[in-house]
Amino acid sequence: MMQDLRLILIVVGAIAIIALLLHGLWTSRKERSSLFRDRPVKRTKQERVETPIESLDEGVGEVRVRTSHPQEKPSFNHLDDDDDEVPVIQHAETKSAQVKTASRQAPFASVQTDYDDPLLGGLSAEQPPHDLSRDPLLGKADESYSQPQHAEPPHVEKPAHQVAPQQHVESQQEPVAPAPEAKPQKLKETVLVLHVAAHHGGVIGGEVLLQSVLQSGFQFGEMGIFHRHLSPAGSGPVLFSLANMVKPGSFDPDTMSDFSTPGVSMFMMVPSYGDANQNFKLMLQSAQRIADDVGGVVLDDERRMMTPQKLESYKARIREVLDANTIA
């Protein structure tokens, strides 16, 4: 866009200059034609000057030299230095001849100027060339042409002044933009599992199991399994849960009297609500109570007999998760 605007200004300026030059040349032609019309007055003055010169020529006699080419400049190199009157007479005679020749060619010059090239307009030897720089019209043309040049930079720089505030506004708005929030680091979790199984490949009756589970503070709830809440009445967050050892792991309290299973599984998430160590201790006590009620045994997550070493392993896992989440 800026290049197109600059090109348009240059073309308009060039057209204005050419128009002003043509107008100035046309004005100078009119002035030359008016000068040619005034030539008869000059001829009358020159004829008056020729009269005393001719009388002087008659007094000199044969020493006078006339030239047949009035347009050529006289040469004084071949004249005798002792004769003082000859250069004066010869110069006067040559000047009179040039005046006569110019007066004869004046009508033709005035006619030819109408057909001559306006840039090469023929000028006589005595007429000084017209100074275009002194023409008042061309002086105005220079001023008018200089104005677009001074006016051009604002047009070119105007978009820059319009863009600058936008850049300044953007730079001010950048700090306001909300920084992307760092995603919180996911807490480390683990699942602790205990099993209550029947002895020697036996099964646990559903009715006995249901009574023991309810007496241990479990409530039937989501996913068709039993949950131990913070309150034995079933209120508060879930501390741990109990599911069937056989898939899909759910129960149906209405058909528990006709139900039997080789065992149940108890599990809790770490971290959990409250103290994880106390919640695990409560889950271990509930498992031991149910095992005593149904005549089963408590097994670890690998379905092996619970040992003191395995209990320490559970406690170590709880401490590891809690410490990792505390550092994070």
Curated annotation (Swiss-Prot):
Q: Does the keyword Cell cycle apply?
A: yes
Biological source species: Yersinia pestis
Q: Which SMART domains match?
A: ZipA_C (SM00771)
Q: Which GO terms describe its cellular component?
A: cell division site; plasma membrane
Subunit-structure text: Interacts with FtsZ via their C-terminal domains.
Q: Which domain of life is it from?
A: Bacteria
Q: Which SUPFAM superfamilies match?
A: Cell-division protein ZipA, C-terminal domain
Q: Which InterPro entries match?
A: Cell_div_ZipA (IPR011919), ZipA_FtsZ-bd_C (IPR007449), ZipA_FtsZ-bd_C_sf (IPR036765)
Residue stretches of biased makeup (Polar residues): 95-104, 164-174
Question: What keywords sit in the KW lines?
Answer: Cell cycle, Cell division, Cell inner membrane, Cell membrane, Membrane, Transmembrane, Transmembrane helix
User: Which segments does the topology annotation call Periplasmic?
Assistant: 1-6
> Which terms under GO biological process does the entry name?
division septum assembly; FtsZ-dependent cytokinesis
User: Any idea what job this protein has?
Assistant: Essential cell division protein that stabilizes the FtsZ protofilaments by cross-linking them and that serves as a cytoplasmic membrane anchor for the Z ring. Also required for the recruitment to the septal ring of downstream cell division proteins.
Q: In the record, what lineage is assigned to the organism producing the protein? A: Bacteria, Pseudomonadati, Pseudomonadota, Gammaproteobacteria, Enterobacterales
Q: Which residues cross the membrane?
A: 7-27
Q: Which HAMAP family match?
A: ZipA (MF_00509)
* Biased composition range(s): Basic and acidic residues: 61-72
Subcellular locations according to the entry: Cell inner membrane
Q: What is its main location?
A: membrane
Topology with regard to the membrane? Answer: Single-pass type I membrane protein
Name the UniProt record assigns to this protein: Cell division protein ZipA
In which family does this protein belong, per the annotation?
Answer: Belongs to the ZipA family.
